Amino acid sequence: YEVAKGFIANGVQQGDRIALLSETRYEWSLLDFAIWAAGAVSVPIYGSSSLSQIEWIIEDSGAVFAVTETREHTELMKNLVLGEDGKPLLHGSTSQLRRILEINASAIATLKFEGRPIDDDQVDERIHATKSRDLASLVYTSGTTGRPKGCRLTHANWLSEVHGLLTNPMGAIARPGSRVLTFLPLAHVLSRAVSLAVAIGGGTQSHWSNFSTLGVE
């Protein structure tokens, strides 16, 4: 609730798009749930995305808010933020981005602090107003064959995917008492679906993104 309140305090409306540019980490999942609790739509961006890919996804999705992981990520996106004249610094850009916060620069703490004036009831209203048919996320391809292509996924789509995993033998990993290490990019549908299944199924999840330390001897 506290992080969702921060988004609401920043003027995020029901159905607004919020971009999330980060490698796999705990804050990624926290922000994803907070975006949904605020009634908004998450727009994951691969941490390895190029400048042109980031610009395209921000413009195409209509994201009004973004959370990055590192200073390098923020630098790639900063020229897309609207200036005082209501236009982005990047000439010719159609970006609608109003603000960027950075995970490594206390984004979570900032959102919690800014959301303090918001009542729990306002978050409850956003949650109750969200229907299964509503858009939950715009998921883009990695862009290996051209511009990243966006896929519109509703809350019903995610619930169906999670139900399929939990009713499959693979669903055993999501049972209470199980422990799962999530290390694949959460911008990828399968990794995110498994992550959601673990959360809903009652398992315990850890996040990691340093592939060099995941080798098996």
Please provide the spans of the model-predicted regions.
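Conserved structural elements of the adenylate-forming
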Residues: 1-2, 132, 151-172
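Conserved AMP-binding/adenylate-forming
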Residues: 3-49, 183
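Short hydrophobic alpha-helices that are characteristic scaffold elements of the AMP-binding
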Residues: 32-38, 60, 188, 199-200
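Short beta->alpha connector loops at strand-helix junctions that form conserved
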Residues: 45-47, 69, 209
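ANL superfamily adenylate-forming
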Residues: 72-132
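Conserved pre-ATP/AMP-binding loop-to-beta segment of ANL
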Residues: 118-140, 147, 173-179
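Conserved AMP-binding/adenylation subdomain of ANL enzymes
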Residues: 159-179, 186-217
